[in-house]
Amino acid sequence: AVHVIHSGESGIFIPKVEHNMWVQKGTLIGEIVTPITGTVEEEITAPSDGLIFSLREYPIVYEGSVIARILSMS
């Protein structure tokens, strides 16, 4: 199955993983921060074990933006 991860907040996306990386459920994928203060608005975690095969490169995100896609083997 493919899990598409969306942003729940608007701001700047700072990735904490790399493309083509294996992650476990709960792994921190990245953070959404406010551009002026740098306050973390959202921590985005992996919903399942799997392979990150798509990871956002453009840092500006809006609520609902696609952040990553994970290929899960379960």
Positions of predicted regions on the chain:
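C-terminal regulatory/interaction regions
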Residues: 68-74
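Generic structural motif
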Residues: 1-31, 35-67
